[in-house]
Amino acid sequence: MPPKARAGAAVKKVRRKERKNVAHGQAHIKSTFNNTIVSITDPTGAVISWASAGQVGFKGSRKSTPFAAQLAAEAAARRAMEHGMRKVDVFVKGPGSGRETAIRSLQAVGLEVGQISDVTPQPHNGCRPPKRRRV
């Protein structure tokens, strides 16, 4: 005899992953001094897949390396290609070391890279920058 559900017990809803069929999209690469985050979106800006150097498995100062950015871009691109992504326009933001490496790895995985734009925000004399490092 199967066990009966208790009265008032919460029923867990399982959310199934839906497969979006998007052939063309955008790759947003945010490369800071400490990490690199790659988000792949559809043309309207809704995120399809993302990956970061920390999510791929790097910790501490190794997150800021070009190799970590390469693995993060590959992981995000593979996940986006499962949803049918074939071509991306790349938007790069930030001064980090993983900018070019991430773009190259998007191409190496098999995504066709269209235009590449640098959308790094430039202050019009806004916030005071961090003090100079004394090493």
UniProtKB/Swiss-Prot annotation:
Pfam families with a match to the protein in the record: Ribosomal_S11 (PF00411)
GO MF annotations in UniProt: rRNA binding; structural constituent of ribosome
Residue ranges with Low complexity bias: 1-11
Single biological process term from Gene Ontology: translation
Gene3D superfamilies: Ribosomal protein S11
Renumbered residue ranges of the record's region Disordered: 1-22
UniProt KW Transport keyword: no
InterPro entries: Ribosomal_uS11, Ribosomal_uS11_bac-type, Ribosomal_uS11_CS, Ribosomal_uS11_sf
Record flagged with keyword Transmembrane: no
Entry keywords, A to Z: Ribonucleoprotein, Ribosomal protein, RNA-binding, rRNA-binding
Function of the protein: Located on the platform of the 30S subunit, it bridges several disparate RNA helices of the 16S rRNA. Forms part of the Shine-Dalgarno cleft in the 70S ribosome.
Full protein name: Small ribosomal subunit protein uS11
Organism: Salinispora arenicola (strain CNS-205)
